[in-house]
Amino acid sequence: MFCYCCTLAPSCSLFYHSTSEEKIEDKNSKEDGSISFLVVGDWGRNGKFHQKDVADQMGLNADSTHCDFVISTGDNFYVKGVRSIRDRKWKKSFENIYTANSLHIPWFVCFGNHDYQGRINAQLKYERKSKRWKTNKRYYSFEKEIPNSMEKVLFIFLDTNPFDGTLIRRKHSDLSKQDTLAQKKWLIETLSSSTCKWKIVVGHHPLYTTGMRRGQMLDVRQSFLSVFEKYQVDAYFAGHDHDLQHQKPKGFTHYFVSGAGSEIRSVSHDSLQTKFAVSDHGFMNVELKKDALNLTVINYLGKELYKTTIIK
């Protein structure tokens, strides 16, 4: 059985449709029967555009929910990525912003188009300098065991940038050198060989969005939609659009956009597949149990804007 339900804050002004190459092995040590993590994207702006406020609320939330790790959906450093592991942006946009002890946990990141305007290798190498930056591949996967159960969760992080034809035409650094066929083959092999109950995929580009990127993601959607459906990916998290969304088109997969870690942009509300969409600074908290995924959207003031549960 696969179903979901959702709620949102009564005073929240937003749109809502009601409906009747490397695997990292890791075991979770929590005893409450859940894995919990935060999802934030499009954040690296020296603390501006409420980035620091979002970071502070992330710290409070991570502390109260005992978060295990943070997921970044990309565009980690504006406007042109970082140049080296000694780039000042590491301090100004990351180390001096996400300062709460509760955020000194693993950060699993993917890369966005703005990251590609710098040197991706600098972000891949930062793991050598930081204990919490846990990304040294452009795309990768790991499994986590759900405490007090025999079930596992598969997390897959994609590099969606080379699948975006508009970026290739703009000649973003390194993109033309990427082998999209190899990455897609790896994705299919990883999904098809998995025995995990839950499958979560993360990438920068959304497959579905009602934000400013609407209509621009057809290349990415055509590359991954059939794969997600065939192998029953439960949820796909993206950024790129600077807002917070839950899209549920026909099919198996739920699509979330968490790209509001700093600057935000407008989002439209005219699609029947849109379960939630808001232009507000914030992030998502996800609690994953054996039979349920509970997701909460929280803004930069700590207000819960939306909740949804996927039961499996």
Task: Locate predicted features.
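N-terminal export leaders
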Residues: M1-A9
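Extended active-site neighborhood of metal-dependent phosphoesterases/phosphodiesterases
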Residues: Y78-T195, R214-A235, D241-K289
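A short C-terminal boundary segment appended to hydrolase-like catalytic domains
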Residues: E31, T274-K312
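Active-site flanking residues adjacent to catalytic metal/cofactor-binding acidic residues
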Residues: G41-D42, G74-D75, L158, G203, ...
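N-terminal active-site segment of His-dependent metallophosphoesterases
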Residues: C12-R88, T210
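Short acidic, glycine-rich surface-loop motifs adjacent to enzyme active sites
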Residues: S194-G211
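Conserved acidic residues
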Residues: D68, D75, K197-K199, D234
